[in-house]
């Protein structure tokens, strides 16, 4: 028996999740050069709300200087940074993306953050001070070792 279509407010994907999936499908169709990919990341950052935009700009600058081996690209419509194999290592999700109260710096399974049998992969960001920036640099260095 075929599953019934989900209607109304029942279980299923949110409007924001569907938009992210459409963005990912577009990204797979249009794999452009490195300059175009970075331009697309910068356009995504420019479209963010001011507090998240400032943090995303700073995260982008940190990653470009501290992890130049990571290539900027978009991933599900978010700024992301991929290794030489094209695997996303980390990404920046603005608060508006999924209507959360904080932005997120997230790491994928390609990041080498393993620490025992359990470790964090997403970090909430409300503000970036020098302490958070130092933590980000340390995490990215671990993730790319």
Regions picked out by a protein language model, each given a short descriptive name:
Residues 1-145:
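Charge-dense, helix-prone N-terminal extensions
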């Amino acid at each position: 028996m075929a599953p019934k279509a989900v209607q109304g407010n029942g279980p299923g994907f949110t409007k924001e999740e569907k938009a992210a999936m459409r963005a990912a499908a577009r990204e797979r169709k249009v794999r452009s050069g490195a300059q175009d990919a970075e331009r697309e990341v910068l356009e995504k950052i420019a479209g963010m709300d001011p507090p998240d935009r400032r943090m995303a700009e700073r995260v982008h600058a940190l990653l470009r200087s501290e992890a130049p081996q990571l290539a900027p690209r978009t991933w599900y419509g978010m700024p992301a940074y991929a290794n030489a194999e094209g695997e996303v290592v980390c990404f920046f999700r603005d608060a508006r993306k999924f209507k959360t109260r904080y932005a997120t710096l997230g790491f994928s399974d390609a990041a080498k953050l393993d620490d025992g049998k359990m470790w964090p992969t997403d970090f909430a960001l409300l503000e970036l001070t020098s302490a958070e920036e130092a933590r980000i640099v340390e995490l990215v260095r671990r993730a790319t070792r």
